[in-house]
Amino acid sequence: MTKLKDQTRAILLATLMVTSVFAGAIAFTGSAAAERGNLDADSESFNKTIQSGDRVFLGEEISTDAGLGASNPLLTGTAGNSEGVSLDLSSPIPQTTENQPLGTYDVDGSGSATTPNVTLLAPRITDSEILTSSGGDVTGSAISSSDAGNLYVNADYNYESAEKVEVTVEDPSGTDITNEVLSGTDTFVDDGSIGSTSSTGGGVGIDMSDQDAGEYTIILEGAEDLDFGDATETMTLTISSQDEIGIELDSESVTQGTDVQYTVTNGIDGNEHVVAMDLSDLQNDATTEQAKEVFRNIGDTSEVGIANSSATNTSGSSTGPTVETADIAYAVVEIDGASAVGGIETQYLDDSEVDLEVYDAGVSATAAVGQDATNDITLTIEEGGTTLSSPTGQYVVGSEVDINGTATSSDSVAIYVRDDGDWQLLEIGGDNEISVDSDDTFEEEDIALSGLSGDGSSILSLTGTYRIGVIDASDADVGGDGSVDDSLTTSEFTSGVSSSNSIRVTDQALTGQFTTINGQVAPVETGTVDINGTASGANSVLVIFVDERGNVNYQEVSVDSDGTYDEDDITVGLTQGRVTAHILSVGRDSAIGDGSLPSGPSNGATLNDLTGYLDTLDQNNNNGEQINELIASETVDETASDDLIVTETFRLAESSTSIDSIYPDAAEAAGINPVATGETMVIAGSTNLKPDDNTISIEVTNEDGTSVALEDTDEWNNDGQWMVEIDTTDFETGTFTVEADDGDNTDTVNVEVVSEREDTTTSSDNATDTTTTTDGPTETTTTAEPTETTEEPTEETTTSSNTPGFGIAVALVALVGAALLALRREN
């Protein structure tokens, strides 16, 4: 019986095993039949049932009714950012990698190839387009309604295994018109359809020929879940009511010399069109090469040149008609999508209205001569202008300035100056012209207008009010020899492209000052001074020092372009005592004095020549006063001299530093004053040393010679007054020594630190306090009255706090108690 039961159990177990294997096979077969990604075969727009090895995407909602989503809805990441992270297929997959890392997920996180797994990817559309039946890409372009009857919307994307991309078309108001414009019934785009121009290429066909003019929106997105982020794409298509080829300008009115962009519109992708203008619109003196450059070879331009009815002369060619025998200047542009872009160089065009014409596809440049254009537009060319921004206003003889301005129609300009007669050329540069940059500006820097060659510069070397102007260099070549003329009449100047301003020429000016400390420079051997000032019109100034013994020292200092100069640490290098200091600048004539010096030269003497004369003076036996007179006689006091000079005096002295006063910060006072413990001690003094370059150290020592404080300063004004502050909180009372040390000199004083500083200032509020510290007020009645008032509370306080025992009341109670006790005992 037992054996029979065992056999029965074995049979049942075998049956269960066979049944489970068979059921698994059936389940596998069923899943294979619904293989994810076979959307084309199943005519499905999406499939959310997945199996091991499938790809899933961010944002998807996976089916948990069958497949891996039913058997293993919770997976674990195996590597990278996803390692150890759970992927729950029972809920929609998050849309971002921040919430769900990309990577491989399997049922146990092992990463084994035999373990059921999926790969999580980010859905994206990688490319999209709208094509015409001829293959022209019109995405984002404008086409005529007649050309919009057979269009294809295509895309490449990575999530076709999950769902198709669906096409939605919206009109300018945002209304969905997809069903109205579909060429078929399918709104779903197959992956890999890019470039397709047929109904079998996987794209979606649309017919926009019956739609009104306006901008239409074509939206691509997943058919089910994938309608966000990179899984979507939006394109535009503009339908034009104009059926023929058109032409537009980015600006219909420009200044001569300004580049203009034109756009051929409503074209068919790949078609070529001729754009042309009549050569009579060019300037009379335009050359053949310039005529060939009117149309720029940019953008969608494939050819430029000039033509007559029988031949063309293209850019780079040396054969064909010339500007005298050609009829048109032209460009050939190729339509890209629905439009083509080109450009025009207007500097060779006359200032007039120019008709720009476009021809149908297939019309050549030679055929365009004498043939009516399909469309045209008028470009207005206005005469160019020039402006001179600098120099204007005031000009100082000898100074350097920048010459700059604008010229909208010129390759180069020339600068002229006028007094009362003709305009005279300013000879700037080798060819007397200034080139105009591509942004229509011109500039020459650091030009000394009064120091150039020619009559124009001579005018500006004398004070007065004149006119300075700029003119197109081609208009300044009245003689026609290829170079600007030396002079122009007023009529010649104003008839050209020109403008002018007033300019006032003034003499040079000199200011300057020497920086000393309290009128001194120290020490004698190494003392230096700083100088600064203005010397308009000068390139440099000469600084001269003369001491009382007649010794001379000097240094040349350059002047900046703004007319200022600034030089630090000029060594005086003379003997102790009074020093006379000069700052000298040559005047408008650029010569020292009358141009001659005793040591040479006989004319045209410069600052450099003057230094040789100063060396001679330094070797003779004249005293300082005589040397100063000799310098003046050869410079500013010389006949007809226009030199300029600034003179100051100071003392060259040995360095010195002293302590002048010590006081508490709350009570400023002259001299050495006591300071109470806890107050801030202010130590003030004077020096003749330069700040920053020197430091004054202050050390405070007690009666034992121990240093208790050390401070320093390198900041003081030109009056030489310095100050430091020291906290005395940790000081004991007594006499302290304060020493100031500048590195070469010291000064020492003693100061008292007291427990309480005496205050001699009294008021009605502190009269009582004052009487306790002085002899006089102690005998007054005022002192006695408060004393009596104080005694009364003192007696009360004494009674309550100093009575021995328990007090009188307690003693009486004790006596009564003792009596009663004695009476009780007696009874």
Swiss-Prot record:
Region (Disordered): 73-111, 755-804
Subcellular localization: Secreted, Cell wall, S-layer; Cell membrane
Post-translational modification: O-glycosylated on 4 to 6 threonine residues; glycans consist of Glc-Gal disaccharides. The N-terminus is not blocked.
Transmembrane segments: 804-823
Residue stretches of biased makeup (Polar residues): 73-102
Signal peptide: 1-34
Biased composition (Low complexity): 761-787
GO CC annotations on file: extracellular region; plasma membrane; S-layer
Family matches, as InterPro entries: Csg_halobact, PGF_CTERM, Surf_glycop_sig_pep
Primary role: S-layer protein. The S-layer is a paracrystalline mono-layered assembly of proteins which coat the surface of the cell.
NCBIfam families in the record: halo_sig_pep, halo_surf_glyco, PGF_CTERM
Name under which the protein is recorded: Cell surface glycoprotein
Protein source organism: Haloferax volcanii (strain ATCC 29605 / DSM 3757 / JCM 8879 / NBRC 14742 / NCIMB 2012 / VKM B-1768 / DS2)
